[in-house]
């Protein structure tokens, strides 16, 4: 199980993980690592939250919010943001399904993808600033948001099909069992409720799961399934929705 955790950490983040820690693990086994997603989100969000706490006394809330969101993007190598941009480029092209998938595979950034990145990053910075002004514990909020975003992404894997013939998303999409889905969501709920006591964390998690479930259904109807890009989009939007739900 520890090998699976390190493999997942290396897979969806840019944190340095020695290869020997996940040695001997086949790529096909990665689908079992979905239950680790909330914990990985907890780590990434925790680092982002610490950066906010350390910088806020020195440069104020707005700049601290900017740098903590920048740190989160760097920690993931922009992996999920790239998926968000590609998804928006494809979906909003208003082309046939096959052409949408081709556009999503194109490495060039389009207008819709650029607008999506600007909107999501700016929205995150603004909502983090507003939460801090309201006295929200930002270490807990950011850690819980990242756990919720990654945990809720399982809703785009369970009982969904892969929209392409091959790709990284094929490791998870359609390969996750109902038991793994329940465990992943349950762990994300536990993280959110422990870090944000009372109904605040639980309510934000419910809102996030509902929004991501609807997103998954809309993407399935439009693309005929999910891709690695749509998973990245779900994670980014899940984080933002969770933070907005805390307001």
UniProtKB/Swiss-Prot annotation:
GO CC field: plasma membrane
Q: Does the keyword DNA-binding apply?
A: no
Q: Which residues form a coiled coil?
A: none
Q: Pfam families this protein is in?
A: CobS
**Source organism (scientific name):** Salmonella typhimurium (strain LT2 / SGSC1412 / ATCC 700720)
Which cofactors does this protein require?
Answer: Mg(2+)
Give me the reactions it catalyses.
alpha-ribazole + adenosylcob(III)inamide-GDP = adenosylcob(III)alamin + GMP + H(+); alpha-ribazole 5'-phosphate + adenosylcob(III)inamide-GDP = adenosylcob(III)alamin 5'-phosphate + GMP + H(+)
Q: Alphabetically, which GO biological process terms does the record hold?
A: cobalamin biosynthetic process
Alphabetized, the UniProt keywords read: Cell inner membrane, Cell membrane, Cobalamin biosynthesis, Magnesium, Membrane, Transferase, Transmembrane, Transmembrane helix
HAMAP family in UniProt: CobS (MF_00719)
- Function noted in UniProt: Joins adenosylcobinamide-GDP and alpha-ribazole to generate adenosylcobalamin (Ado-cobalamin). Also synthesizes adenosylcobalamin 5'-phosphate from adenosylcobinamide-GDP and alpha-ribazole 5'-phosphate.
Q: Where is the chain membrane-spanning?
A: 34-54, 59-79, 113-133, 138-158, 187-207
Provide the topology term for how it sits in the membrane: Multi-pass membrane protein
Underlying gene: cobS
Name under which the protein is recorded: Adenosylcobinamide-GDP ribazoletransferase
Subcellular location(s): the record lists:
Cell inner membrane
Q: Which family is this sequence assigned to?
A: Belongs to the CobS family.
Q: Which InterPro entries match?
A: CobS
For this UniProt entry, the molecular function terms from Gene Ontology, in alphabetical order, are: adenosylcobinamide-GDP ribazoletransferase activity; cobalamin 5'-phosphate synthase activity
The enzyme's E.C. designation: 2.7.8.26
What metabolic or biological pathway is this protein involved in? Cofactor biosynthesis; adenosylcobalamin biosynthesis; adenosylcobalamin from cob(II)yrinate a,c-diamide: step 7/7
Task: Please state the protein's primary subcellular location.
Answer: membrane
